[in-house]
């Protein structure tokens, strides 16, 4: 159970400048201070706990999860927490069609695995250099989903504004979305919104670790 004091200490309550707000976030706001919207942490705690409970139940039934967060503040913690709980992640650039064109993505994953196992000793220097460039690009794009053999059942999104393409693909396929939603975002863009500061690393660390713990709990049931 997440405590409000923990959220406060991590700066989860600090939203964006009031002039940048999305009016749909009004129900989740506590007040405004010095031109900054302050998020209602009572609601954040409730909705975070609700999301954690959902994850635990879903994962206990064998559902798989994809973490998505490609902006610099989110990249490292997304990889760390997804890896810790044994799930998948995208923390660089979202590949358009990753979910809606899964067959093509599978072929790229196959190509990546082939390159990982390739013997480049017999190649010319130019050929080997070209393959290494291709391999490095695929490493950045694919390493978080290298063992993903089907589309995920749940996608956790840091900043639905930034990851709009991923969110739209999830909606098209009926994939459950859980989003960390700041005051400039639309909470209705995801199935389960967690109102929170999506720019501070401490805030993202706290929330994503809570979600990862819920996944681990589900796997232990």
From Swiss-Prot:
InterPro entries: Ribosomal_uS2, Ribosomal_uS2_bac/mit/plastid, Ribosomal_uS2_CS, Ribosomal_uS2_flav_dom_sf. CDD domains: RPS2 (cd01425). Keywords: Chloroplast, Plastid, Ribonucleoprotein, Ribosomal protein. One of its GO terms (biological process) is translation. It holds the Pfam family Ribosomal_S2. It comes from the Eukaryota. One of its GO terms (cellular component) is mitochondrial small ribosomal subunit. It is found in: Plastid, Chloroplast. One of its GO terms (molecular function) is structural constituent of ribosome. Belongs to the universal ribosomal protein uS2 family. HAMAP family: Ribosomal_uS2_B. PANTHER family: 30S RIBOSOMAL PROTEIN S2 PROKARYOTIC AND ORGANELLAR (PTHR12534), SMALL RIBOSOMAL SUBUNIT PROTEIN US2M (PTHR12534:SF0). This is Small ribosomal subunit protein uS2c. It comes from Cyanidioschyzon merolae (strain NIES-3377 / 10D). The gene is rps2.
